[in-house]
Every structure is written in structure tokens, then in C-alpha cells.
């Protein structure tokens, strides 16, 4: 059973990288699939992150994620720049297939793919993303205090945030 890994992590945002660090420190020899296009998750598209502990004056999203990636590398987690395209999570041994057609087996799988926002197709929506158009009320609500805003989509969670 030497080709069966202890743990495979899918996703390379803060949760995926944190899982990889802890798994590596526990000597589980994790494999982390960081994606084929943009590793680092949604924070790679974020400017200043002011609510992450340890950065009193804030930190740029890409800088934070690069620092986390270096920490993952330091603990010798195996980082694969590819997407997982299919999974069979039934049974004791899980099987994952990546975009290159490689299959990896593991006893445990951590899914840390994060979330994705949905654009609604307004003119200039992409251009104004991060400059008035926001995708995270919890993250960005602070910047819009005492202003008139519109909340679109998200079901109950949009109003709760």
C-alpha cells in the first residue's frame, strides 16, 4: 500500500495552506493541489487585507498567500500545480484524478476549495470589482458604513452579512 498517501488537500487558499502546514508538521506527508490557474485562492485577487491577525498595518493579499506558500514548502508538503477533475470518496481509500490524468490515492482528503462569487453581468462590474463592487459583505462592509448600498443575491446570507 505504499502508493496510498495519508492525506491529499484540494485548494490553496488560507484553509488549504494551513491544513498542509499542520499535516506536514504531523509527518503525514501531505499532497496539496493548488490549482492550475491561480494558486492562493481568492486572496490573490484582493488588495489590502486588514483583518488578518499579525499584520497591524494590513498586508496585500498576494503577499500573504506567497508567505503562506513558502511556509508550506518549508515543511516539505508536496505542492502540485493542477486541478482535481474527479474524485471517488467512497471506501477507505479515496481516489482523485487531476487535470493531467494522474490518479492519486489517499486515506483522507481535505476539501478546501473556498468559494466563488457570481457576477450578475452589469456594465463595468469587472472594472469596478474592489472599487465599489464588493463580493464579501463581511470583508468589505466596513468601507461602506453610513453609505447607501445595494445588496444583490446570496439568499439569506446576503442580508445576514
Regions found by a protein language model. Give the residues of each.
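N-terminal glycine-rich anion-binding loops that anchor highly charged ligand groups
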Residues: 32-45
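N-terminal Rossmann-like dinucleotide/flavin-binding domain of flavoprotein oxidoreductases
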Residues: 44-103
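Extreme N-terminal leader/targeting segments of oxidoreductases
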Residues: 1-7, 66, 74-75, 120, ...
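Glycine-rich beta-alpha-beta "Rossmann" dinucleotide-binding loop(s) and their flanking helix/strand
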Residues: 100, 109, 113-136
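Core beta-strand elements of the Rossmann-like FAD/NAD(P) dinucleotide-binding domain
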Residues: 3-5, 98-108
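Rossmann-like dinucleotide/flavin-binding elements
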Residues: 2-4, 9-35, 129, 135-161
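Glycine/Thr-rich phosphate-binding loops of Rossmann-like dinucleotide-binding domains
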Residues: 40-41, 119-120, 159-161
Amino acid at each position: 500500500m505504499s502508493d496510498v498517501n495519508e492525506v491529499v488537500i484540494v485548494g490553496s487558499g488560507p484553509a488549504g495552506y494551513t491544513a498542509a502546514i499542520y499535516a506536514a508538521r504531523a509527518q503525514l506527508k501531505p499532497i496539496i493541489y493548488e490549482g492550475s490557474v491561480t494558486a492562493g485562492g481568492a486572496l490573490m485577487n484582493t488588495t489590502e487585507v486588514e483583518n488578518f491577525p499579525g499584520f497591524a498595518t494590513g498586508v496585500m493579499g498576494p503577499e500573504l498567500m506567497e508567505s503562506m506558500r513558502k511556509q508550506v514548502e518549508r515543511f516539505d508538503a508536496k505542492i502540485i500545480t493542477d486541478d482535481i477533475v474527479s474524485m471517488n470518496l467512497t471506501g477507505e481509500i479515496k481516489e482523485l484524478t487531476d487535470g493531467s490524468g494522474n490518479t492519486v490515492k489517499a486515506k483522507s482528503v481535505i476539501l478546501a476549495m473556498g468559494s466563488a462569487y457570481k457576477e450578475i453581468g452589469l456594465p463595468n462590474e469587472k472594472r469596478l470589482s474592489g472599487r465599489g463592487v464588493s463580493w464579501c459583505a463581511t470583508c468589505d462592509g466596513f468601507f461602506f458604513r453610513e453609505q447607501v448600498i445595494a445588496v444583490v443575491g446570496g439568499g439569506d446570507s446576503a442580508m445576514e452579512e
